[in-house]
A protein has these predicted regions:
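Juxtamembrane extramembrane loops of integral membrane proteins
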Residues: 32-110
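Conserved small/polar residues in nucleotide/adenosyl-binding loops
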Residues: 404-413
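Membrane-proximal low-complexity regions enriched in glycine and acidic/polar residues
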Residues: 80-84, 90-145, 320-382
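Hydrophobic alpha-helical segments
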Residues: 137-219
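Internal alpha-helical transmembrane segments
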Residues: 1-42, 195, 199-283
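Short, structured motif recognition centered on aromatic/hydrophobic residues
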Residues: 11, 82-88, 96, 148-150, ...
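Short loop/beta submotifs within extracellular cysteine-rich repeat domains
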Residues: 91-95, 101-104, 155-160, 168-170, ...
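Juxtamembrane segments of multi-pass membrane proteins
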Residues: 260-368
Length: 414
């Protein structure tokens, strides 16, 4: 008991501030989420593509980019010319013009300034080149680094972030978002830039802090119950053997301790990242199986010869599914053309990719689905869920717009 009391007391002294921060910052996050660029805003910031000027075939570009290394391919307009954007496993990005195959030069301040002036009607206050800052520290931005941060002289004090590789808008924040997120997500996730830019270190720090928090709370609940039983045995009707603040700490701990433990455990599990449980992220082998081969091999079959003309076409994305390239067209505000994903086609591709498992169920993920909301965030509307009969009771989630293999969770833990 003395050892447990010592641990609870001093872990509480060290972690008490973190508990308070996690709770209060979590309340802020309920109302102000971390800044994220909306898809329609991203598309609006792009320029129209001159599809007639696309003269370099995709197989030529893919060969030049590296057929075995490329993981994604799309077309946008850069400098009023169509350009291929190649993504790699290493999170690198390469841009080449689609009219002659030459590399797109890195963007400079002048080109970014001209683009902002053309796409916004707001005056510019400042432009600077940044490698990392608080709102672009996530690893999903690595391919676009360094970025140009453009500060607008508007009432919202808007900051725009543009890739130095492609010139695309990749992030947008306002003064209100930044203020509340310093009190919310930055505190809640222990997200200072100097720590978060080292993902593995940040992940380890948060995981162990949460584990020690669980230990502190569990010991506290146990000690609280033990003291409660002792005093009830000695004095009928008494709730606590302590006085003053210790008494209130004991009584409140008895009622709220289990809630605190479940709260800390749930946060700790969200940071597991494969330590104790499987992750829902598909492996490269699983992605390749759904694609019907490597992305480079499948997408090299793409042809733009019959590509319809759209006056406001902003982006062409190429995906791979079941050995066939899939072309998805997006306009200024929305996806305007995508092939229809037939149930029989899904079943055939999944059966081929997972020959040792049978398909038990095929369904459309409903809005507000429990496991989707807790484990994977929000999936696109109309996402298909395929349930397999393997030992892990695997589910596959496939986006019906892009045919992208989104997640692959096994037995659910909520």
């Amino acid at each position: 008991m003395k050892v447990l009391t010592f641990l609870h007391r001093w872990l509480g002294v060290v972690l008490g501030l973190f508990f308070a921060m996690w709770f209060l910052s979590g309340m802020v996050m309920m109302y102000v989420p971390f800044p994220s660029l909306q898809e329609n805003v991203r598309l609006t910031s792009l320029s129209d593509i001159d599809t007639k000027a696309i003269t370099i075939p995709t197989d030529t570009v893919i060969t030049a980019c590296g057929k075995n290394e490329i993981t994604a391919l799309r077309v946008i307009s850069i400098d009023a010319r169509p350009a291929y954007i190649c993504n790699y496993k290493s999170r690198k990005v390469k841009a080449v013009y689609a009219d002659n195959g030459s590399p797109v030069p890195p963007r400079d301040q002048l080109s970014i300034r001209q683009h902002v002036e053309q796409t916004t009607n707001k005056p510019l206050k400042f432009i600077t080149l940044v490698e990392y800052d608080q709102w672009t520290v996530h690893q999903k931005f690595d391919a676009q680094r360094p970025m140009y941060r453009v500060e607008l002289a508007d009432s919202d004090e808007t900051h725009l972030y543009f890739s130095s590789i492609t010139g695309e808008l990749v992030q947008l924040t306002t003064d209100t978002q930044r203020f509340w997120n310093y009190l919310g997500a930055v505190v809640h996730w222990i997200y200072p830039t100097i720590l978060r830019k080292h993902w593995a270190l940040w992940d380890t720090v948060v995981w162990w802090l949460s584990l020690f928090g669980i230990l502190c709370a569990v010991i506290g609940v146990y000690l609280g119950v033990v003291h409660f039983k002792k005093i009830r045995h000695l004095r009928q009707g008494a709730l606590s053997p302590f006085r003053g603040w210790m008494k209130w700490h004991h009584i409140l701990g008895l009622f709220a301790g289990f809630i605190v433990v479940s709260w800390i455990v749930s946060g700790w599990l969200s940071m597991d990242h494969g330590r104790l449980f499987s992750t829902p992220n598909p492996t490269m082998e699983q992605v390749k199986a759904i694609q019907g081969g490597s992305f480079g091999e499948v997408s090299s079959k793409t042809s733009f010869e019959d590509l319809p003309e759209y006056p406001t076409l902003r982006e062409i994305k190429i995906h791979a599914f079941g050995g066939e390239p899939i072309i998805v067209l997006s306009s200024k505000h929305e996806t305007i053309k995508t092939p229809v994903l037939e149930p029989n086609r899904v079943s055939a591709v999944v059966s081929s990719a997972f020959p040792k498992a049978n398909i038990e169920k095929w369904s459309i993920v409903p809005p507000g689905d429990t496991y989707t909301a807790l484990r994977e965030g929000t999936l696109p509307p109309g996402t298909i869920r395929v349930e397999l009969s393997d030992k892990g009771e695997t589910w596959l989630h496939i986006d019906t717009v892009s045919y992208t293999h989104l997640t692959l969770p096994t037995k659910r833990i909520v």
